[in-house]
C-alpha cells in the first residue's frame, strides 16, 4: 500500500502511479485540485474493477459522528431539517489561499454532512463575511458556505482558519423532533421529547 501526504498539486500523479501498479492507496485530501483529475482517477479505478483508493476523510470513523449517524438513521427524532457546522483552526500557514479554506478545511464538513444525511448537494454557495485581521493578506477568512441537499436539508458551514485560540469542530443536526449535537469535548448530546 502507498500513503500519499505530499503537497496538494502532486496527489493526482502519485495516485495514478499507484493505480498503474494496482496498489492500495490512501491519499490525503484533496484527491486532486480539479474535478477532471478526480474523474480521471475514478475512471482508472473502475477500469481496474476494484476500489483501491481511499481519501483521508476520518470523521466517518469518529465515535461521536457515528453515534450522530445512528440517531439520524433511526428516525427517532424525525427527519433532518438543517445542519450547523463550524471548523476553526488556530492559524494558517504561509501561502494558504482562499480556495484552501474549501479544499483543505471545509471539505471535511462537505463530506461528513453528505454521509450523515445520505443525500447529495443540489445548491452550494460561499459567502464572504466580515474579515478577520488574523488572516494572510488576500485570504478570505472566515468563510461561510450555505448548501441545500436534494431532499431539502439546509446546511451552513463556518470555516475560520486563523481563530487565534485552537482547533474547534462543531456539528449540530436539527431534526423535526429534536437535535443531535457534537459539542466540545467530542461527546454527543441529544435533545428531544422523552
Regions found by a protein language model. Give the residues of each.
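Alpha-helical elements of Rossmann-like donor-binding domains used by nucleotide-donor carbohydrate transfer enzymes
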Residues: 1, 13, 40, 67-70, ...
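N-terminal Rossmann-like NAD(P) cofactor-binding module of classical short-chain dehydrogenase/reductase
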Residues: 1-5, 26
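Short glycine-/small-residue-rich Rossmann-like dinucleotide-binding loops
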Residues: 6-7, 159
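A contiguous active-site-proximal alpha/beta segment in oxidoreductase catalytic domains
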Residues: 9, 26, 32-93
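Rossmann-fold NAD(P) dinucleotide-binding segment
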Residues: 9-28
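Short glycine-enriched, charge-decorated loop/helix-capping segments at active-site entrances
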Residues: 97-101
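Contiguous beta-strand/loop segments that form the cofactor/metal-binding neighborhood of enzyme cores
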Residues: 104, 108-189
Amino acid at each position: 500500500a502507498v500513503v500519499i501526504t505530499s503537497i496538494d498539486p502532486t496527489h493526482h500523479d502519485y495516485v495514478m502511479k499507484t493505480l498503474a501498479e494496482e496498489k492500495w492507496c490512501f491519499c490525503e485530501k484533496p484527491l486532486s485540485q480539479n474535478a477532471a483529475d478526480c474523474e480521471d482517477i475514478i475512471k482508472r479505478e473502475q477500469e481496474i474493477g476494484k476500489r483501491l483508493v481511499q481519501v483521508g476523510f476520518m470523521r466517518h470513523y469518529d465515535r461521536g459522528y457515528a453515534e450522530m449517524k445512528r440517531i439520524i438513521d433511526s428516525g427517532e427524532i424525525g427527519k433532518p431539517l438543517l445542519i450547523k457546522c463550524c471548523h476553526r483552526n488556530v492559524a494558517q500557514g504561509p501561502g494558504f489561499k482562499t480556495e484552501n479554506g474549501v479544499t483543505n478545511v471545509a471539505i471535511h464538513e462537505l463530506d461528513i454532512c453528505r454521509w450523515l444525511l445520505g443525500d447529495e448537494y443540489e445548491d452550494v454557495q460561499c459567502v464572504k463575511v466580515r474579515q478577520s485581521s488574523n488572516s494572510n493578506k488576500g485570504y478570505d477568512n472566515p468563510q461561510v458556505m450555505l448548501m441545500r441537499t436534494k431532499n431539502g436539508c439546509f446546511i451552513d458551514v463556518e470555516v475560520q482558519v486563523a481563530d487565534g485560540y485552537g482547533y474547534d469542530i462543531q456539528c449540530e443536526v436539527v431534526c423535526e423532533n429534536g437535535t443531535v449535537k457534537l459539542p466540545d469535548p467530542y461527546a454527543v448530546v441529544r435533545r428531544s421529547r422523552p
